[in-house]
Amino acid sequence: MLKWILGLLGLVAALVAGPFIAGMFLPRQHVVSSSIMLSQPPDSVWALLRDLGGYPNWWSDIKSSVPDEQGGDEEVWIQKDAQGHALPLLVVQSIPPALLVTEIVAEKLPFAGVWTYEIEQVGAGSRVTIREDGEVFNPIFRLVARLFLGHHTTIDRCLAALGQRFGEQVIPVHVPQ
């Protein structure tokens, strides 16, 4: 009987410690980029991306996006996802109609990162690229992100929603780093 109990405890310990240890061997930081082509001119794409308050109107992952009144001189937005998790975003750089950089400014999240949106004119349309410079602090979340979610998932969903907002079917292309 004691062997069974010890065996069961060992199994539970392995199930808890195994993912943690595996996650410790994965890098904390990652850099990923994805791009899409749109038939829209850069000014139109810029207007949509720069309107952080309008994201819930076209990206279903974002349920609300409001300016943070306590941002002081900095432009900070609080975006909430479908589960109600708040993500405070600082606008780091804004160069119309080509470059927007936002950074997660929360201290108690299991992740952090910077999104760089680049809009390039290509013919009469635009190439839109989102680069994520991310960091996942919790080793178990690192393992889950690597095995089940993928680091491109959120930027790909954003780009697909952007294309859909303009009535275009797009498939994000992963850009090698």
Please tell me what each predicted stretch does.
Residues 34, 87-93, 113-121:
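Hydrophobic/aromatic beta-strand elements that line small-molecule binding cavities or substrate pockets
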Residues 50, 54-57, 96, 160-167, ...:
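Sec-exported extracytoplasmic/periplasmic mature domains
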Residues 53-88, 94-99:
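Short beta-edge strand/loop motif at the mouth of beta-sheet-based domains
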Residues 7-70:
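Hydrophobic ligand-binding cavity/cleft-lining segments
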Residues 39-43, 92-98, 118-127, 164-167:
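A short, structured loop/turn motif at beta-sheet edges
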Residues 104-157, 162-164, 173-176:
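Beta-strand/loop substructures that line and gate deep hydrophobic ligand-binding cavities in soluble
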Residues 1-3:
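N-terminal hydrophobic targeting signals that begin at the initiator methionine
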Residues 44-49, 55, 77, 91, ...:
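Hydrophobic pocket/interface hotspot
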